[in-house]
Amino acid sequence: MKGTIFAVALNHRSQLDAWQEAFQQSPIKAPPKTAVWFIKPRNTVIGCGEPIPFPQGENLLSGATVALIVGKTATKVREEDAAEYIAGYALANDVSLPEESFYRPAIKAKCRDGFCPIGETVALSNVDNLTIYTEINGRPADHWNTSDLQRNAAQLLSALSEFATLNPGDAILLGTPQARVEIQPGDRVRVLAEGFPPLENPVVDEREVTTRKSFPTLPHPHGTLFALGLNYADHASELEFKPPEEPLVFLKAPNTLTGDNQTSVRPNNIEYMHYEAELVVVIGKQARNVSEADAMDYVAGYTVCNDYAIRDYLENYYRPNLRVKSRDGLTPMLSTIVPKEAIPDPHNLTLRTFVNGELRQQGTTADLIFSVPFLIAYLSEFMTLNPGDMIATGTPKGLSDVGDEVVVEVEGVGRLVNRIVSEETAK
């Protein structure tokens, strides 16, 4: 695999049945209207035969599934044309901790090291009636059929490409049933399906997995982009949320990034496109189980982004979902990195946003709920951070319209210019 791993939750009918009561939670009080997307970042991806690390004190579930492999660039693909964009399929295992809620992104449950084994790509034309088997230590443990998915492969590719450009090598995990197989250290997990080579991985106590030898991917053009929601108390109050007790972390896909003096598209028929000036922390060396006291040693430097959000698309599932935050070109970012040494205190910087020359947003990183060292320590506790990974630290309180010029700046780090255009102008 060489691309982004997208995955979909709540896509099996058994999940929809199991979560009916939860679907009535405020504020939406409805089941998901669209596919519920998430991302498996590069630290999760391993190949056949590599160990799945077992986190101490946790329950671990094997989620046998199949991955659609994108064969060519796909943007706004119609369902009936989807087959033209599919290079093939691969067996995969969406390893996860149990989830008690789908309200927030499941970073700690889904994005730990080695939590996404993927097998070899096979050039099959259709997997809409495929039985997927799981064996534990050579014995049958579970099976299910893809005909029970809420949305099939073609529908998922069409739905995702509506807002996110897919590139060759990107993958889409098609989902898992509600009931999955519990696994323990010492187990060998084998995923099988007709027409595919088996995908087999040992489960190993994470303390025995010292270093990741390799990723079965080509070098990434940039690292994983983590982003923070509600990390300024005034922004949380503006959105009528209590400040979180634990960081609200979500992931942004590579398609969302654009540069300085570029344009971002405001979708038609929406009301709430928010601009969000953010300080971005760039990781300089591999970090795993880093203490808060040592965390700044792993920072290479800083840059600036504008983390636009289309809040019209918020639902109750993995808020803020990919339709809100990972649309094409929705995250302008400066390409230059200011070295850590040039910023003595990243927690004493002024952030400003100007719209058409008018100051609309101003805040200070002194008001961060979770500091830079805390965020690095928090993330590295359950996943490996790699050089080039980035953490967008959140935004103070502060809508943008077609034709607006939006300038965001972070004191001492940089100034980023972006213009908002309509869907018609962008064509």
From Swiss-Prot:
This is Homoprotocatechuate catabolism bifunctional isomerase/decarboxylase. GO terms for biological process: 4-hydroxyphenylacetate catabolic process. Decarboxylates OPET (5-oxo-pent-3-ene-1,2,5-tricarboxylic acid) into HHDD (2-hydroxy-hept-2,4-diene-1,7-dioate) and isomerizes it to OHED (2-oxo-hept-3-ene-1,7-dioate). Its cofactor is Mg(2+). It comes from the Bacteria. It comes from Escherichia coli. The keyword Calcium applies. Belongs to the FAH family. Its EC number is 5.3.3.10, 4.1.1.68.
